[in-house]
Amino acid sequence: MVKFFQPKISPLPDGIDLKGSTAVVTGASAGMGLELTRQLLQLNISTVILAVRNVAKGENVVKQLRGDPHIRTYNGNATLKVMELDMDKYDSVQRFAKHLRDEIPIVNFLILNAGIGLLKHDRSPSGHDRTLQVNYYSNALLIAELLPYLKASAERTTIPTRITWVGSRAFETTSLQKTPLQPNERVLEHMDKKEFFAPFQRYGDSKLLCLLFMCSLARQIDPKKVIINMLCPGMVNTNMSDVLPVYLRAVINVVKAIRARPVEVGVWIILNAALVAGPDSHGKFLIDKDIASESQYISSPAGQEVQKKIWEETIEELSRLTTLPPEVN
């Protein structure tokens, strides 16, 4: 059971200096993505790639960050580069990956922050449910496209590259617990069917797919080359609730006023997973700053079967789009 009041979170430890490092932040033009970029700059990072759907908005964010007195004084020479990445479209993901590989020699940190939570069933150009496309499919493709490049970055720096994926403990609310798969039913086809769309559980469904894919992928990756983990920052005071109906938004805004963490604190949790958590976090899910125990659903026979199917079906999907590296095959 989730406690109403969230535990207090301490800031990052002193002494973190990211000079010489490069980070990619998806969804960097607002909310936690914007604050992630700000805090990385405050930690003296040399280069941040702002991966955004709206390039003009991204450029305005760069101007805003350049105007920050602290950043201007202490890290004014940092490189901030805006690149287009629309997670709703596979071809945008592939263009972004090529652009990144062609222009940026080394990436040390890939922070997968972009995400949505829609309450209506809508489809992406791929034909998939839009929430699943943005939160899951496109992230899986992005990782597959970049994994050899991230491994090469680690070989050049002799330090593991980090992939940190923003998840949510909402995965525990998955609709699959109430509407289990039929014996021969495919998970991804099930999720795409309108009759199985559960508005208040779809976000959790998408985060379950992310978590299960990450856990399976981590088994294939050498953590001496790439460390991948996932975290839940808890309830954070962002604008994600703006998609709710007015009557629900009013209630949630009251709850957020009492319970939600400031965006700054939510980002401490993300950066803890990306910068502080050790190799033991590889393939793990972190709640706040701690590695969580495996959920009852995931460890159950039904959950294990779903995980196996998700991996196989996702590989089948991705193989139609790109040449997969050995780890994703």
Swiss-Prot record:
Q: Does the keyword Oxidoreductase apply?
A: yes
The record's listing under InterPro entries reads: NAD(P)-bd_dom_sf (IPR036291), SDR_fam (IPR002347)
Which pathway does this polypeptide act in?
Secondary metabolite biosynthesis
**Which SUPFAM superfamilies does the UniProt entry name for this protein?**
NAD(P)-binding Rossmann-fold domains
Coiled coil where? none
Swiss-Prot/TrEMBL keywords: NADP, Oxidoreductase
Family annotation (Pfam families): adh_short (PF00106)
Record field: transmembrane: none
> What residues form the catalytic site here?
203, 207
For this protein, the Enzyme Commission number is: 1.1.1.-
Binding-site residues, NADP(+): 57, 86, 113, 203, 207
Name of the protein: Short-chain dehydrogenase/reductase tropG
